[in-house]
């Protein structure tokens, strides 16, 4: 197989990821050792040593291990506000603070069916997230938005859970959207380590 993975596998991973909700724009994939491998490649390729990666305060501990091994660290924002909704203010403040310190920012959002809370960002939440990163892009910052979709197939009907993906069409050139695809959960291929970074 080629280093990037078999073309048929990569096209299947893209098709499964988007399930008819593929955003307009350039798409490519590389095979990885599960979703964890996708996360690791993203951190290795897009995070400068010493920089911080942003995710929510409820997060999979392996994010921290990956960042530490690659010379970066995890910074968190408070996921929920007082009404148990996505904390738009905390997210925006954290993005703003990190963009004042670094030229590039990788943001990891584990959604839909966030582990461990089960929370899925709503269409309105995604609008806020994208408004926040677009504001930083206007200042010349490079933003990588990594969506960890490990549990997407447990979040509801496949087309409904992927509707947000079409919001990624037409983003500024300095916003890169990435997906950590995994066959470990929904396909029960955990030991097979089948994943892709899309």
For each feature predicted by the language model, list its residue ranges:
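Conserved core of the PLP fold type I
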Residues: 1-142, 152-172
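Active-site PLP attachment segment
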Residues: 161-198
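Walker B catalytic acidic pair
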Residues: 149
């Amino acid at each position: 197989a080629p280093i990037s993975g078999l073309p048929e596998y990569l096209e299947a991973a893209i098709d499964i990821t988007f399930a008819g909700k593929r955003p307009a724009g350039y798409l490519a994939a590389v095979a990885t050792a599960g979703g964890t491998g996708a996360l690791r490649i993203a951190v290795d390729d897009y995070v400068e040593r010493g920089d911080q990666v942003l995710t929510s305060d409820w997060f999979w501990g392996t994010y921290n291990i990956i960042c530490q091994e690659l010379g970066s660290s995890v910074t968190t924002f408070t996921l929920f506000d007082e009404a148990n909704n996505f904390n738009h203010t905390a997210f925006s403040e954290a993005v703003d603070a990190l963009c004042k310190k670094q030229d590039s920012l990788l943001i990891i959002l584990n959604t839909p069916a966030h582990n461990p809370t089960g929370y899925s960002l709503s269409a309105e939440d995604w609008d806020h997230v994208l408004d926040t990163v677009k504001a930083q892009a206007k200042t010349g910052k490079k933003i990588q938005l990594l969506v960890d979709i490990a549990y997407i197939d447990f979040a509801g009907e496949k087309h409904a859970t992927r509707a947000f993906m079409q919001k990624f069409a037409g983003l500024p050139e300095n916003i890169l959207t990435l997906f950590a695809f995994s066959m470990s959960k929904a396909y029960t291929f955990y030991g097979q380590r089948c994943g892709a970074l899309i």
